[in-house]
UniProtKB/Swiss-Prot annotation:
GO function term, MF aspect, one: asparaginyl-tRNA synthase (glutamine-hydrolyzing) activity
Species of origin: Bacillus pumilus (strain SAFR-032)
HAMAP family: GatB (MF_00121)
Catalytic activity: L-glutamyl-tRNA(Gln) + L-glutamine + ATP + H2O = L-glutaminyl-tRNA(Gln) + L-glutamate + ADP + phosphate + H(+); L-aspartyl-tRNA(Asn) + L-glutamine + ATP + H2O = L-asparaginyl-tRNA(Asn) + L-glutamate + ADP + phosphate + 2 H(+)
GO biological process: glutaminyl-tRNAGln biosynthesis via transamidation; translation
The gene coding this protein: gatB
Function statement: Allows the formation of correctly charged Asn-tRNA(Asn) or Gln-tRNA(Gln) through the transamidation of misacylated Asp-tRNA(Asn) or Glu-tRNA(Gln) in organisms which lack either or both of asparaginyl-tRNA or glutaminyl-tRNA synthetases. The reaction takes place in the presence of glutamine and ATP through an activated phospho-Asp-tRNA(Asn) or phospho-Glu-tRNA(Gln).
Disulfide bond residue pairs: none
Domain of life: Bacteria
UniProt subunit comment: Heterotrimer of A, B and C subunits.
Pfam families: GatB_N (PF02934), GatB_Yqey (PF02637)
Name of the protein this chain belongs to: Aspartyl/glutamyl-tRNA(Asn/Gln) amidotransferase subunit B
Amino acid sequence: MNFETVIGLEVHVELKTQSKIFSSSPTPFGAAANTQTSVIDLGYPGVLPVLNKEAVNFAMKAAMALNCEIATDTKFDRKNYFYPDNPKAYQISQFDKPIGENGWIEIEVEGKTKRIGITRLHLEEDAGKLTHTGDGYSLVDFNRQGTPLVEIVSEPDIRTPEEAYAYLEKLKSIIQYTGVSDCKMEEGSLRCDANISLRPIGREEFGTKTELKNLNSFAFVQKGLEFEEKRQEQVLLSGGLIEQETRRYDEASKKTILMRVKEGSDDYRYFPEPDLVELYIDDEWKERVRASIPELPDERRKRYIDDLGLPAYDAMVLTLTKEMSDFFEATITEGAEAKQASNWLMGEVSAYLNSAQKELEDTKLTPQGLAGMIKLIEKGTISSKIAKKVFKELIENGGDAETIVKEKGLVQISDEGALLKLVTEALDNNPQSIEDFRNGKDRAIGFLVGQIMKASKGQANPPMVNKILLEEIKKR
């Protein structure tokens, strides 16, 4: 029997507001434990929540960017459960009237475009953070308690772990472009749970789903889903039944491990939040928020292709992250040619960032520095080979490209007399290469050019070297 995989994703995104959703407590990441909390966050008796309007604006902005319909009437509800990181024993969330519904995004997998539906986007408060010491007790930090977040629930339209990965990449990109969140998984501002089930091909009814947690990266999401897909298939083929349960992905064993039997929504005993009135969002408010949405990745990608003449692949890679795209924009604003700027960002810059495991913001490279270097290449002041030395200096120490070239004596040698001397020495020292070239071995020219570049420490002008070299060989 062949099965079809059905995947749905629940993504939690912390909103980048200055204060929490129902209190004035600050939200910056990295503060000492339990220094960014208040009696409201901790649920002391007699305190009342006050809704943060900016959190509502940010949630609407995210929902609109994801093509959701924005509710006119929305409300908050209590989601009741006990856990040490939840001091009130309930979480203020949204149940039956979310702020956004019926959205979608488009992903590309293996050259094909697919639309993934978004069931809903709702506002809620985050919980605290538990740290398990391994000594029989756990520590709790309530700094995160009450931080505003949106939960984005996809339709069960995803059919492969690869599609799940592509969906998360696209969702993260869109949210980052709106500016409502930095989406840093390492800081917990983006978290994902995955639901997966299998059903016989052709059947409409869904199979029993399993929820996956402890997915600390998009790669873990994909790996966890791949393992769970195989596990469920083996269970079903052997005549077993899939239990509705929550499992976690363990990177060490590369398996999913049972955490608990999954609870249903009824177990949370949702009821309307009595301390908050229903929220009315009129058309004027919606339009103000809509007008604040910046250019999104798909729009920017189209502009790069249509207006800047970039290949579709370049445009796609450059717009994957807002940081890279903004850097590219600033670089061409400084006068760099678009394709050259794209080549450097996709090539040397990306290679350096991957190797050093850094973000662009963690380096000394500036758009002005990169643009200056590209212009020096275009003018013939430096060669592409020398440019790599300049680039290393720019990204590690910063500075001005022209100044670096002058101080380090990296100006390209374009003087014909100096180049003729280098060519003559190379020919005198390698007579066999001359014979090889005359006998049809074109690689001999490459060898001679290499000798000249080595002698000039990479500073000889390659096109001029080739020209003079061919002329001098003819004379011999």
